Regions:
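Secretory targeting signals
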Residues: 1-10, 32-109, 156-163, 167-170, ...
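Conserved glycine-rich helix-kink/hinge and helix-boundary motifs of the Major Facilitator Superfamily
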Residues: 30-34, 119-122
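Terminal transmembrane helical anchor/hairpin motif
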Residues: 61-84, 115-118, 123-204
């Protein structure tokens, strides 16, 4: 759903006149647009998690929220409270959404074709499981945000052989995704400035 509607909501080609009525710098305009869309997506995620845990609590009792459950961190077993797990999921989802939204925003600046952003997002989402199935494990994989987009594997699949090195962690993932999002934001702003200068040069 995110990939289908992102190119539409983040499309600036048809709305450049908004900058005339709202005289702010281009990078501030893009930042506000990306931030507002990110907040909407996070609100939907929080609502979905709330409904899931509400149904679960009504079915199995409210004590279920305070009862720790078993998780794996590498080869080690540990106990984690449900609310702690929800916090980790929300933090990681926030980073993943921020990365994907900035990626799609950059694709929108590069091409008017909205399918470009959709295809780029799909490729990033499926890159990690495809590489894993092909036994492609670069030494720097834990530094690449695309290996963390499939965050279910990171949060739940720590005992998988792909994570036995212990370098694929939540903290590394959040840092990698935030850096990746910042890089794509800079690329989006830079591409926008270049296109605007090129357009003005063409008019002259």
């Amino acid at each position: 759903l995110l990939l289908f509607i992102s190119p539409i909501l983040l499309d600036d080609w048809k709305h450049r006149s908004m900058l005339a009525v709202k005289p702010i710098r281009q990078w501030k305009y893009l930042l506000q647009k990306i931030s507002s869309y990110w907040l909407v997506n996070m609100a939907l995620v929080i609502l979905a998690l709330f409904v899931v845990f509400l149904v679960q609590s009504l079915s199995f009792g409210w004590d279920n929220l305070t009862t720790p459950f078993l998780v794996f961190r590498g080869e080690e077993e540990a106990l984690m409270f449900p609310l702690q797990f929800i916090g980790i999921v929300l933090l990681f989802a926030a980073c993943v959404f921020l990365f994907l939204i900035n990626l799609v925003a950059w694709c929108n600046q590069l091409s008017r074709n909205k399918m470009v952003g959709f295809i780029a997002g799909v490729m990033v989402i499926w890159a990690e499981p495809i590489f894993r199935s092909m036994k492609i494990y670069p030494s720097f994989a834990d530094k690449l945000p695309l290996y963390y987009v499939n965050f279910g594997s990171v949060i739940q699949g720590m005992k998988d052989d792909f994570y036995t090195t212990g370098t694929f962690t939540i903290s590394n993932g959040c840092a990698s995704l935030l850096v990746g999002a910042f890089v794509f934001f800079l690329l989006t702003v830079g591409t926008s400035f270049w296109q605007e200068r090129h357009r003005r040069g063409g008019l002259v």
